[in-house]
Amino acid sequence: DKLASEVILKLKNKNPNIEYLSVGGSNLKNLGIDSIFDLKEITYLGFTSVLFNIFKIRKKINITIKEIIKFNPDILFSVDSPDFTMRVASKVKKINSKIKTIHYVAPQVWVWRKNRVKKIKKFIDHMLLLFDFEKKYFDEENIKNSFVGHPLIEHKNIRTNLDNLIATDKKIISLFPGSRKSEILVLVPILLDFIKIMNIKNYDYSFVFHSTDENKELIVNNVKDSKIENIDVISDDNIKSKILSSSIFAVCKSGTVSLQVCSANVPSIIIYKLNIINFMIFKFLVN
């Protein structure tokens, strides 16, 4: 949703007459983009979660395909979430081959399921890559691709005066529990335990949870229940960037946010937690 909104914003500035239809979240909604349904309705964490909701996901895929064909766009622009977007793109292409398909954020074929590349070229006309090393995987299968870089690297992190934002008399530690509700429910308790341990050793820290607007209340409620005082929860993107740049280190969920932390030159600890079934499945599939 965030990546798509940045692309759409630039397109709107160049051509305000383009019409859009999406499966998006709050960022696209803020740009006035109509959504078939909210992105949260297809956001599931782990293999087992997807398996338990497979019929709901299939229904959403079919609804999305139906609405795309009805909308009859010139371009189907899909972003990340390959297990959803690739299925949609594949079926749309079969129904109407005139619709050009562009996918942004290539599937991580260098990590697992490398053979996906052979299938992708049947329905994706152009792949936009975040990382330069990805090119060889798609060049090998003659899939048209362009290295466009990662938008997070474009964002400059500027150290600034944080007065009135958080407790600036303490050392700042940024915490990133993820954007999915399922991730937050698992990782926030772990991060709160981490804070308790850190406070026993040294209370001279200010811990800041980086949240989305949608998930802020959930994190705030967890923080209140913990009764830990030296914690702030922020959702404003401009403030988050400033606080991250002023942090002594960060603890973050594995994923895109780890690149953001790295680009800010902030040392980090990467965390994640899978249940045992998801762990064993992923261990079997990884390259």
Stretches with model-predicted labels:
Residues 168-174, 205-206:
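Charged active-site motifs of nucleotide-sugar-dependent glycosyltransferases
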